[in-house]
Regions:
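Short hydrophobic beta-strand element within catalytic cores of glycosyltransferases
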Residues: 301-304, 323-326, 330-333
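Membrane-proximal helix-turn-helix segments that form the acceptor-binding/catalytic region
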Residues: 24, 95, 99-110, 125, ...
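Nucleotide-activated donor-binding/catalytic signature segment of Leloir-type glycosyltransferases, i.e.
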Residues: 223, 259, 266-296, 301
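Glycosyltransferase donor-sugar binding loop
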Residues: 42-44, 254-269
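Conserved donor-binding/catalytic core segment of Leloir-type glycosyltransferases
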Residues: 217-247, 256
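Conserved acidic donor-binding segment of nucleotide-sugar-dependent glycosyltransferases
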Residues: 345, 350-358, 367-373
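A short, well-ordered alpha-helix in the C-terminal region of glycosyltransferases
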Residues: 367, 374-389
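Carbohydrate-associated surface elements
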Residues: 182, 199-202
């Protein structure tokens, strides 16, 4: 290892919304590297959440752009708006990728790191520019940015610029990682590039030490509990299919959804939800990253209802399915390429169904809740899969090996 080598991680999100960056920074810091994370400040609330995370870290965090009310924030928002409009009119502007791309590049350049690692659209664009300037760079593709939206949603997205970033970094960056074998192989094939190192989006097994048995979500009825989590509760996330499936599940269930939900969509869910079958629906706000595992672990079955489209969603492995395993939940997941990869390594912990197939979803839910033995076996398999494969303790060595190869 290159002792005291300085690594700068560049991202376009807050730490509290970017656990992969937090885990990466922590692993590199523990390995002896000097680590700086460069990312934006959107508002005071998210900044406070970031600071809470940083109380237990030794690595440095710096603002790439401050979007709170100030001249810098106003200018960054204006450039983003102009860049998006320009792209919609047929141009290609990096400012359409996110806020503060120019200031992020300028501040990254001033750090003078031995290695820069780009995350998300802004971060990967920045390290692409630094590569041209002779810097040593790496990239993490948590998503396939050119294929992470449906066609109707790509207006204003600078796809040509993103393709250049992906192609160049996959071919020429010295350290490239992604979240699944399915995504790694697809991107490598598309760009005729080396296959990236796969680092699963896992969480530390040690996080289980903080779990307690005090329920915060469950209603105390003893009914089996289903849990679904995402940043946003809304259409196109499998919830309508879940409502149809529960019509064919005779055993009364409690269903817990966690995320930001608009009142009008909450009303639509209530209207669809089959409460006449004895099921109850609970909608919870998001909680801090430190609280999430404890909330997940209260429940019996986790729902990972991803879609085949866009392609990035089909190929990647999201945080939620691995968080469910770490929480000791049986999992019902749609059979995307990424989630098949998890199911293959998780024995009987994960049952698969096609997206929008309510009959099969109902059958897989019934499989887990038909008896205590069925559920306990699946939950035991989930914990074993988390401990042996899908935990950060198992994934971090792959990251460190790749970095050591670059900096030796």
């Amino acid at each position: 290892m290159a002792t005291n080598a300085h690594i700068c991680i560049v991202t376009g999100s807050h730490l509290c919304r970017n656990p992969r960056v937090v885990k990466e920074a922590g692993a590199l810091d523990e390995a002896g590297y000097d680590v700086t994370v460069l990312g934006p400040v959107f508002n005071d609330d998210l900044r406070a959440e970031d600071r809470a995370l940083l109380t237990e870290t030794a690595w440095d965090h710096r603002a790439s752009v401050d979007l709170r009310p100030c001249i810098e924030g106003t200018w960054a928002r204006l450039r983003r708006k102009i860049g998006t409009h320009w792209t919609r009119w047929g141009g290609e502007s990096p400012h359409a990728l996110g806020y503060g791309v120019a200031s992020t590049l300028r501040r990254a350049r001033s750090i003078g790191a031995d290695l820069y690692i780009g995350h998300e659209e802004v971060g990967t664009w920045v390290v692409r520019q630094l590569l041209d300037e002779g810097a040593r760079v790496g990239a993490d593709f948590e998503d396939w940015h050119t294929r992470d939206l449906l066609p109707k949603d790509r207006v204003g997205r600078p796809l040509g610029l993103l393709e250049d970033v992906e192609r160049t970094l996959l071919r020429h960056a010295e350290h490239v990682t992604t979240t699944s074998k399915a995504l790694a192989q697809a991107m490598a094939s598309t760009y005729e590039a080396p296959v990236p190192t796969v680092i699963y989006n896992a969480f530390p097994w040690a996080d289980r030490e903080a779990l307690n048995e005090t329920p915060r979500d469950r209603d105390g009825s003893g009914r089996p509990s289903l849990h679904w989590v995402s940043q946003t509760i809304g259409p196109g996330r499998g919830l309508e299919t879940l409502c149809r499936a529960l019509q064919d599940v005779e055993r009364p269930m409690q269903v817990h959804l966690r995320g930001q939900c608009r009142p009008d969509y909450h009303d639509r869910l209530d209207a669809r939800f089959p409460s006449e079958n004895g099921h109850d629906l609970f909608v919870h706000d998001l909680v801090s990253p430190d609280e999430l595992l404890g909330r997940i672990a209260e429940h019996d079955v986790g729902l990972a209802l991803e879609q085949y489209e866009p392609e990035s969603r089909n190929r990647t492995i999201t945080n939620k399915i691995l968080h469910y395993l770490l929480g000791g939940l049986a999992v019902v997941a749609t059979d995307t390429d990424g989630q098949r990869e998890v199911a293959d390594k998780a024995d009987g912990a994960v049952r698969l169904c096609a997206p929008d197939d309510s009959d099969e979803l109902a059958r897989q839910i019934r499989h887990f809740v038909r008896s205590e033995n069925s559920l306990e076996r699946a939950q035991s398999d989930a914990l074993r899969a988390a401990r042996e494969t899908f935990s950060w303790e198992q994934q971090a060595p792959r990251l460190l090996t790749s970095i050591e190869t670059v900096l030796r």
